[in-house]
Amino acid sequence: MAPSPRPQHVLHWKEAHSFYLLSPLMGFLSRAWSRLRGPEVSEAWLAETVAGANQIEADALLTPPPVSENHLPLRETEGNGTPEWSKAAQRLCLDVEAQSSPPKTWGLSDIDEHNGKPGQDGLREQEVEHTAGLPTLQPLHLQGADKKVGEVVAREEGVSELAYPTSHWEGGPAEDEEDTETVKKAHQASAASIAPGYKPSTSVYCPGEAEHRATEEKGTDNKAEPSGSHSRVWEYHTRERPKQEGETKPEQHRAGQSHPCQNAEAEEGGPETSVCSGSAFLKAWVYRPGEDTEEEEDSDLDSAEEDTAHTCTTPHTSAFLKAWVYRPGEDTEEEDDGDWDSAEEDASQSCTTPHTSAFLKAWVYRPGEDTEEEDDSENVAPVDSETVDSCQSTQHCLPVEKTKGCGEAEPPPFQVAFYLPGQKPAPPWAAPKLPLRLQKRLRSFKAPARNQDPEIPLKGRKVHFSEKVTVHFLAVWAGPAQAARRGPWEQFARDRSRFARRIAQAEEQLGPYLTPAFRARAWTRLRNLPLPLSSSSLPLPEPCSSTEATPLSQDVTTPSPLPSEIPPPSLDLGGRRG
């Protein structure tokens, strides 16, 4: 592991307070504070900090470069420090501590200012000496997940940290004049990147750049637009650092000493996306513009990454789905009935997705099979080879496409017949035909029957009845079959027999009374009935014989009374004897 630039026993205030990363409000306040306290804002305490850093660089040019080892004994560390360096660093720390910082404002400072000891002043000065030109290492949970930019002023053992992303090199104070000019040119290129539409890239803090940056701050405030008014501290690394702390190689550091800013710019690798984090988890969740608009093809992922503009919009991997998926424009094409050649060409071109299963070929419905008109007289004629080939080619066509191959005729239009009085009725419609599949099955069944007697033509045959009668017994359930065969006629038969029996009994009893002799005697008796007596003095007429009978008057309609009911002649109607 590479040594840390600051003591390991000191915890950063962001590490001590883990809820800083979990609270969106704290993150928002931190970004706002970093933006307000950026290098472009003309604050008094920031100007003093920059001036102190410049003084440190000027003093360091007169002294040999510090040793890159961070964990030195206290005796060597105290012995190597110079009074000029310690004095400038102490003045810088005191000036920064005098101002208010975000950790102090929020109450997140972990180190109390009263915890310092007088004997540790030399150690603090040496820490400032080592951290002046070294990159600031962020906490482990902040390196990939949340990279807060801007100046972070933390009161940790009296050390002031600048959060500018620094280059991967050490020994910055011992730099040549040519390197200084290269740094200035790279800084001018980075300053020009604040224009609108610029994508953030890696920004490098190089010693000797503070003077040029301080002069640019005044001119940039007046020229920058709203999109370019953001602080340069927001420019952060757009890619993950490929090298971890334990994989840092000294050869790469030496190569970066000559041109530190150019190496940082070369690491960009061209224009990168505007949002990129150092964690794979954030890469999966960070929104990148254009991700939701790219069309991906499941069947060919490699070709979709290379050229997504020429891929199919609705890919389907199944041949069965390809056959049934609706494609716009297929049913809107106008087809000419007389142009069979063009229809066959279209059918051959559209037959690109054959069914892979024999089961689907047998059961999948193809439009046009039931509308094909076949002549009954041509059933025996052989089928041409060309027609067979064209039919085989159209068997694989899509169901939605309307092909005219293999002699398929257009279905007849809907017919309506109007019968008007006094006009000749329309001819009868043709009988509906079976679908093509059923016609083929019937043809296969009728084929052996036609070949039984080939000498006799079809139209010359006569109907012959066989003398041998075959009786087929129908096996049915007794209960339901008998109940169905009975019906109401059985009840009618019972009633009819009952009524006939009653009629016979009545005729047997009334038969003697209906004879002509009995009828004559009855009329005679009715004719000889006595009239009612008006008075008692009138003599009663004697009964006359049948020869003396006179025609019966029409007034007498009552039958003759029985002999027992005839009153005696001497009995008066009034109940008195005469």
Curated annotation (Swiss-Prot):
Annotated region described as Interaction with SMAD7, given as residue ranges: 319-417
Membrane-spanning segments: none
Region (Disordered): 101-122, 158-314, 330-353, 368-393, 532-578
Compositionally biased tracts (Acidic residues): 292-306, 331-347
Biased composition (Basic and acidic residues): 111-122, 209-224, 232-254
Region (Required for localization in the endoplasmic reticulum): 1-165
One Gene Ontology term, aspect cellular component: cytoplasm
Modified residues (Phosphotyrosine): Y236, Y365, Y419
Pro residues bias locations: 560-570
One GO molecular-function entry: protein phosphatase regulator activity
Biased composition (Low complexity): 532-546
Post-translational changes noted in the entry: Phosphorylated at multiple Ser/Thr residues. Phosphorylated on tyrosine by LYN; which impairs its antiproliferative activity. Phosphorylation at Tyr-236 enhances proteasomal degradation, this position is dephosphorylated by PTPN2. Polyubiquitinated. Exhibits a rapid proteasomal degradation with a half-life under 1 hour, ubiquitination depends on endoplasmic reticulum association.
Sequence repeat windows: 279-318, 319-357, 358-375
Biological-process GO terms, alphabetical: apoptotic process; cellular response to antibiotic; cellular response to calcium ion starvation; cellular response to carbohydrate stimulus; cellular response to cordycepin; cellular response to desipramine; cellular response to gold(3+); cellular response to hypoxia
Membrane-embedded but not crossing: residue ranges: 22-39
Membrane-topology descriptor: Peripheral membrane protein
Cytoplasmic side of membrane: 1-21, 40-578
Protein location: Endoplasmic reticulum membrane; Mitochondrion outer membrane
Compositionally biased tracts (Polar residues): 547-558
Family the entry assigns: Belongs to the PPP1R15 family.
Subunit annotation: Interacts with PPP1CA. Interacts with EIF2S1. Interacts with PCNA. Interacts with LYN and KMT2A/MLL1. Interacts with PPP1R1A and SMARCB1. Interacts with SMAD7. Interacts with BAG1. Interacts with NOX4.
Protein name from the UniProt record: Protein phosphatase 1 regulatory subunit 15A
Origin organism lineage: Eukaryota, Metazoa, Chordata, Craniata, Vertebrata
